């Protein structure tokens, strides 16, 4: 990815102090989405990265991973699979719990997400990688369906929260912007 694109992206991601709670500096990508030419450049850069890998599906983590993942899946001409919070998918699902700062949460994927085909190649995508809990749980769901996650992709990776290091122990991890 070229440095000019990275700078453009950084300039168009809003930072919101004390959201969703005091002490957090939230990276809001909705401002980036307001600029179609810049969003297209982002998706084109990701398409260039993933086209040679012949992926079968893009797996997006709720909710902003749906935005990036759907656009990338369309650009690549492959299927899109959502990973959602527990209870949000209508058919039979697999569930994975993970730890949060104060308690636990669960995410789910449809049990037929990859059309019953084993060994498909997928890219996992979300807007931001912080502690890595949701991404690691998503990776477990992908493995449970006997798919191969060839890379986990994030627009932003927060280095100080160590999610990048944790995830890299399990899968190749790409963060376009490291903050």
UniProtKB/Swiss-Prot annotation:
| Record Pfam families | Pribosyltran (PF00156)
Record keyword Transferase present: yes
For the biological process aspect of GO, one term held by this record is:
purine ribonucleoside salvage
Domain of life of the organism encoding this protein: Bacteria
Q: Which SUPFAM superfamilies match?
A: PRTase-like
- Cellular compartments annotated: Cytoplasm
EC number annotated for this UniProt entry: 2.4.2.7
Keywords attached to this Swiss-Prot or TrEMBL record, sorted alphabetically, are: Cytoplasm, Glycosyltransferase, Purine salvage, Transferase
UniProt catalytic activity: AMP + diphosphate = 5-phospho-alpha-D-ribose 1-diphosphate + adenine
- Name the InterPro entries on file: Ade_phspho_trans, PRibTrfase_dom, PRTase-like, UPRTase/APRTase
Glycosyltransferase listed as a keyword: yes
GO MF annotation: an example: adenine phosphoribosyltransferase activity
Q: In which pathway does it act?
A: Purine metabolism; AMP biosynthesis via salvage pathway; AMP from adenine: step 1/1
Gene Ontology cellular component list: cytoplasm
Q: What is its main location?
A: cytoplasm
Q: Which PROSITE patterns match?
A: PUR_PYR_PR_TRANSFER
Q: What class of enzyme is it?
A: transferase
Q: Which family does it belong to?
A: Belongs to the purine/pyrimidine phosphoribosyltransferase family.
The entry describes its oligomerization and partners as: Homodimer.
Q: What does this protein do?
A: Catalyzes a salvage reaction resulting in the formation of AMP, that is energically less costly than de novo synthesis.
Q: What is this protein called?
A: Adenine phosphoribosyltransferase
Organism of origin: Helicobacter acinonychis (strain Sheeba)
Gene name of this polypeptide = apt
